[in-house]
Amino acid sequence: MVPPAHESDALTIGFRWVFSNKMPVAQQSGHAIYDPAPSGTLKSGYTWNIRYGDGSGASGVVYADKVTIGGVTATSQAVEAATSVSSSFASDQNNDGLVGLSFSTINTVSPVKQLTFFDSIKSTLVSPLFTATLRKGAPGSYDFGYIDATKYTGSIAYAPVNSANGFWQFTSTGYVVGSGAAVGTSYSAIADTGTTLMYLPTSIVQAYYSKVAGAQYSSTYGGWIFPCASAMPSFSAIIGGQARTVPGSYINWAPISSTTCFGGMQYNTGIGFTIFGDVFLKSQFVVFDSSVPRIGFAQQK
């Protein structure tokens, strides 16, 4: 089983599962499908079930198989083969599953949790780390075992990681909206390439959209909207004592009409922590270092 090396939409800091030929035929349409027959071995009695905050989910069975990503191989990786997925996953033909790069404590396989891909291969790497360089409107890449200095500018700002919950979780100590002054406030955050938007505390989101002409919270759309023509300020998170900035144009996420757009920054209500998803990460070179553990951010070149 060999996914493309630069399959940014399929690699996530969260869980690992794939579309498989064990799903209903209607759900397989338009997707790359995992067939365990050539080399996979069924782990009898092992199942998994994942539900996400947006109501989507998937469930299935488990195989042991050889998995290679970007030249790195796990010889007996637990592959969570979907037997059923929610309609939102079935209709998204840009997504054929998720590759887990988090800590194995987050794994949902029963009766015994399985190692994530990264935990399976990290002992074979020169350094037990990987980096993510996601791009806006262009293919991104992941590197395993080394840091490519040609992909970022300036220094890498590191913050300690709390891995107790299985996430790459760290503390941001403040933020900056546009060219304004830094606001010191600590909040717990995770970096997750499997999440599209940024989800932040209410006070920070309100502070940001107060600087966007015509912005308002819409109960109809369940988030902040604004005139598409509005100038969008940048947003910087203070991480490891340094500001790491996402351009305002990235936060103008998607049109919902010919004149109105939906914001890439929304409330983290009910989540319990901040999530820096792709809207933020596509401006950053991110180092996930399991040796300490720690996470590092630098501005992309």
What are these regions (language model features)?
Residues 1, 35, 40-61, 87-88, ...:
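Pepsin-like aspartyl protease folds
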Residues 1-83, 211, 236:
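Signature of the N-terminal lobe/flap region of pepsin-like aspartyl proteases
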Residues 5-7, 180-208:
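Active-site beta-strand/loop microenvironment that shapes enzyme catalytic pockets
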Residues 67, 100, 144, 194, ...:
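A residue-level signal for conserved active-site and pocket-lining positions in enzyme catalytic cores
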Residues 68, 75-184, 260-266:
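Aspartyl protease catalytic domain
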Residues 84-85, 234-301:
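Aspartic protease catalytic domain
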Residues 86, 104-106, 137, 147-149, ...:
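Conserved beta-strand elements of beta-rich interaction domains across eukaryotes
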